[in-house]
């Protein structure tokens, strides 16, 4: 593994370092000849690298990484939640193969449309709500998704027990608590402290973990040991399943043993689009991210973005208008394709996408209220998930690649840990429409198409993505961030293609967000000049500071690029995550 600096072919990269504050200065990309794992957590990156060194492929390593994050990054890493895995198999065919593992959580059989509405007709708050406690969880999909991926698309050179081992070892022997983790556990103590098992495991019964302290999780280690011995179905039919179902029944939860046994992973076809000679491969529904991403690049294609200047008001204005139109369609038409008809082909039709910018003006913002849904009224009005998600990127020596984004939904999920298992549960039910017509936590009005139905997957913004050239991987990326996920991925890809930035600069660069409603642009603090803000306001753009809930930064995009000439891989962590690491060899 090398960290030799590379020459930058454009002056923009150097300029970026001058305008960005110190905490957003890009770290050197890690250069590797064979394989790379890039995550928000050093232990998880090393777990994936361990499997690569043992002969596993990118899928094997991704599974080990996701399981390890359960131990070392419980903020979002999980086996009690779900997500999406995008896989590229470099199997000798001219273009390889790309596929999606959809292991999103589903609503339990006992779930109902109005289950979170109180007698007063208002949404229930606190324990018993869609966000906190025993009734907030969908059926977890992570173990089933990881198992299917490893069994069907792994190398065959490492076993299921092998890929589980790094996580089991980290839980049994412990890992050193970072400053970030110690602070995070204190910040979320009010949630975790409501539940005895979580209070014991994550808060040391109120005495808290200090930075540098070794944190051992014996119950979680025992769960991983059962998964090693009995296989992944143990989580859904064995002792772990029984413990989950019994605890849920005891505390009035919704998940049953039958729910766990009947959970099914879905394999889906990827979405593909073109942008300036590159191919973008991304997520289909029930993620809204892929359609929105491809729409935005389709709208952007006719414009000479590079000529506008990297940090210019002209570029930000154009991006805001593109985002606004894509998010308008997202709000109207998208939901779980197993339950509603999503007009994917129409939304991605080149003529339709081009027509969305027919009323664009470089001098004036289009008011959000004046942006209609392009295909007429439908009203899916899908809500985004919370920002407490995590992403990781993996590539192996053969060119196989994984872009994986998964979540517990909110930070530390529902706050509930199942006694005897160490498994922290999701609060994914909050991603459904709990009350039609009521605004969600992001202020978006929620519609009927995303209403709770047993077996249904809630819509998501998660957008794991690849960029390919001539069938070969050029970029692997993705991000957490709720509705900002789509725009973060959009900007990282544009930074690489339009501005030729090396991956570390593309990831560290300032980010903006516009989601149609509310009709405003948000920027990361300190990263845009007052002159640029003034020019945008003169065009009629509304500028809003990020709220305390959102934090000062947007997203976390651990990414990998490949040099097609040398075959070298370059992995970049996001400077917005202090515990991040790129591990390669």
Q: Which residues are covered by each model-predicted region?
A:
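Noncatalytic scaffold domains of N-terminal-nucleophile
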Residues: 26-46, 50, 58-59, 63-230, ...
